[in-house]
Amino acid sequence: MLILKGTKTVDLSKDELTEIIGQFDRVHIDLGTGDGRNIYKLAINDQNTFYIGIDPVKENLFDISKKIIKKPSKGGLSNVVFVIAAAESLPFELKNIADSISILFPWGTLLEYVIKPNRDILSNVADLAKKEAHFEFVTTYSDSYEEAEIKKRGLPLLSKAYFLSEQYKAELSNSGFRIDDVKELDNEYVKQFNSLWAKRLAFGRKRSFFRVSGHVSKH
C-alpha cells in the first residue's frame, strides 16, 4: 500500500506494517483523515497507540507528513502513518488490524456513504477492524447552510431520531456496525478536534453534530 513520507509516496508491505504495529498496544484507523492534524494531536498524547490516517488527497497531508519524519525534538512521531487511498479502494494490508475506527466530519461521497449506508463501502471499512472494535462516526450538515449539497446527494435531514431509526440501524448492522449510542452535540464539542476543517466548523455558525458510536460486529 502507498504511504506518505514527507511529500513522497512509498510502498509499505503487509510484513513491514505487521512489524511496526507489533510495537504498539493498539491500532486506530481514521478514514477521511483530511489534513492529518487531528490524529497527529492524538498520537502525541497517546504513544501506545499506532494511528493510521487514510485519505486520497495527499497534498492536504504534506504539512503534517513532513513534520512526523523529523526528529522527536522537532515534532517527529513514530506512531502515526498516512495511507493514500480512497474509501472505495482500501488496501488489503489494513484488514483486521484496527482496535478502533473513526470517520470524522466527512464530506462529499464519504458523507453520503455514512448517512445513506453504502453496504459495499462500509463492509470494506468494517473489514479493517478486529472483532468488537470500537467505531465512531461524527457528521454534520444543515439545510440552513448546505441546502445545495443536501439536494445534490439526496440526503435526509439530520436528527437523533434518524440515526436511531430501525431502518438506519439495520442498514449499518448489515455493513458490520452495531450502534450502541447516538448523541446530538454542539459546536463546543467539536473544539477538541484539531483539523482545520473541524476548527472551521467548531468556530463557525451554530449547528448540530451527531456522534454515532458502537462496535464492529461483522466478524
Curated annotation (Swiss-Prot):
Top EC group: transferase
Documented effect of changing residue 30 to A: Loss of kanamycin resistance. Strong decrease in methyltransferase activity
Binding residues annotated for S-adenosyl-L-methionine, in chain numbering: 32, 38, 55, 87-88, 104-109, 195-197
InterPro entries reported for this sequence: NpmA, SAM-dependent_MTases_sf
Top-level taxon: Bacteria
GO molecular function per UniProt: methyltransferase activity
Impact after mutating residue 55 to A: Decrease in kanamycin resistance. Decrease in methyltransferase activity
UniProt GO BP: methylation; response to antibiotic
Its job: Specifically methylates the N(1) position of adenine 1408 in 16S rRNA. Confers resistance to various aminoglycosides, including kanamycin, neomycin, apramycin, ribostamycin and gentamicin. Methylates only fully assembled 30S subunits.
Sequence similarity: Belongs to the methyltransferase superfamily. Kanamycin-apramycin resistance family.
UniProt protein name: 16S rRNA (adenine(1408)-N(1))-methyltransferase
Organism: Escherichia coli
Gene (name only): npmA
